[in-house]
């Protein structure tokens, strides 16, 4: 029988997963989600399952301590990774976790992070498969993008999904934290997709939704002659306004 905390996390993850799927931000087996159960265990989407139709049985519980040390190992073969993913399961009858479970394990260790979402929205990938990804990541176009996604996003060039990507995410998130004093709310993956993280499912949902909206505006602005970002002083102002902090609390983000 699942603990009460696990039941709550499962319910929120299934809700979030199906919402992402209904929005067509993933198709087939694309994307994944995860949530912390306790200090030792997290739940993550199983390999090949669909976000649009995810059920609780397709959430696999994994041990952090069977995944995180692997990120420091060199020359890990694909066959070894398969074995490591299977061995990370709390129950050996559970479905195999996603190959991207490594980055979920890392991101869920960040202070204040309890949930992670990863999707492949077409508007975002139009940008991430172009030459203007840096502009999209580093600039903001409207106030609510600042409120929901932070003043800047982290852009990571393409890496092979799996262990290599998890290592690059860890390295670049640490650099981002050193520069900005906190982790990014939004991580953009070149030629791949987007990750949002937060303390609640609402934070992950809101950041993902606003990133997709911002991408649609960005693409449209370029079609109409060019992107016009907010001045940096105004971005900083919105990020630190007391009324916007109140809105974040009301939105549970």
Please place each PLM-identified region on the residue numbering.
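Glycine-rich flexible loops
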Residues: 1-253
